[in-house]
């Protein structure tokens, strides 16, 4: 796909940064879009700007702060603690987030003549978010194509990878140290290895430890 262009939904976290490095290897031109939705870890906006500036990637930033007016969760309401709800979902789940992100990304992509959209959602080793499921992404892809009469292709390179395999992918792309030290996954806004306690950090560390152990025994 070296003669194609792509738009990466980008947060500056482990997953989207790994997707960005893969996109840079696979496509002739790559742009990214980041969303400001009043997230607890607002530092991710600065991290996204720094990473894209360093890599020389065109960066679009869109304001979706209205999300905090529509739904209550601990990712946009800083007064809430991060817990697990009765339905088993972390309190950090933001209703409609990926639906809106991908819909706005598609509008932007079409306007720029891009049909490939890349997102780092994953169903294998995740927090149970329903909008990270493969069935949702495929359904939305069809809906967006019909809604805008445009041949979008939503790519989910991490969908069936666990966190250990995601670290392995970053390593194969020559980006292991960059992803480990420069990205922000932590819900408490701590770059790199994070706080170690929030759900995002726990998943990241579990995968990192497993990958390092595997490499050491290879």
From Swiss-Prot:
ATP binds at residues 10-20. One of its GO terms (molecular function) is zinc ion binding. Its EC number is 6.3.4.20. Zn(2+) binds at residues 186, 195, 198, 201. Its cofactor is Zn(2+). SUPFAM superfamilies: Adenine nucleotide alpha hydrolases-like (SSF52402). Homodimer. It comes from Exiguobacterium sibiricum (strain DSM 17290 / CCUG 55495 / CIP 109462 / JCM 13490 / 255-15). Belongs to the QueC family. It comes from the Bacteria. The gene is queC. It is an enzyme of class 6 (ligase). Keywords: ATP-binding, Ligase, Metal-binding, Nucleotide-binding, Queuosine biosynthesis, Zinc. Catalyzes the ATP-dependent conversion of 7-carboxy-7-deazaguanine (CDG) to 7-cyano-7-deazaguanine (preQ(0)). Binds 1 zinc ion per subunit. It catalyses: 7-carboxy-7-deazaguanine + NH4(+) + ATP = 7-cyano-7-deazaguanine + ADP + phosphate + H2O + H(+). One of its GO terms (biological process) is queuosine biosynthetic process. This is 7-cyano-7-deazaguanine synthase. Pathway: Purine metabolism; 7-cyano-7-deazaguanine biosynthesis. The lineage of its organism: Bacteria, Bacillati, Bacillota, Bacilli, Bacillales.
């Amino acid at each position: 796909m070296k003669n194609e262009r792509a738009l990466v939904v980008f947060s500056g976290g482990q997953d989207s940064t790994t997707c960005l490095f893969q996109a840079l290897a696979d496509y002739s031109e790559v742009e990214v879009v980041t969303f400001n939705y009043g997230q607890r870890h607002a530092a991710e906006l600065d991290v996204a700007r720094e990473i894209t500036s360093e890599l020389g990637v065109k960066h679009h930033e869109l304001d979706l702060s209205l999300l905090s007016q529509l739904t209550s969760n601990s990712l946009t309401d800083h007064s809430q603690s991060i817990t697990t709800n009765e339905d088993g979902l972390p309190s950090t789940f933001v209703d409609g987030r990926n639906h809106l992100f991908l819909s706005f990304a598609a509008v932007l992509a079409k306007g720029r003549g891009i049909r490939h959209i890349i997102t780092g959602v994953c169903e294998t080793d995740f927090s149970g978010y329903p909008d990270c499921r493969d069935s949702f992404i495929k359904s939305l892809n069809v809906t967006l194509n019909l809604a805008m009469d445009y041949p979008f292709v939503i790519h989910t390179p991490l969908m069936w990878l666990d966190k250990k395999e995601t670290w392995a992918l970053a390593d194969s792309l020559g980006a292991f140290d960059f992803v480990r030290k420069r990205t922000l996954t932590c819900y408490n806004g701590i770059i790199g290895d994070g706080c170690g306690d929030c759900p995002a950090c726990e998943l990241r560390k579990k995968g990192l430890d497993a990958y390092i152990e595997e490499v050491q025994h290879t």
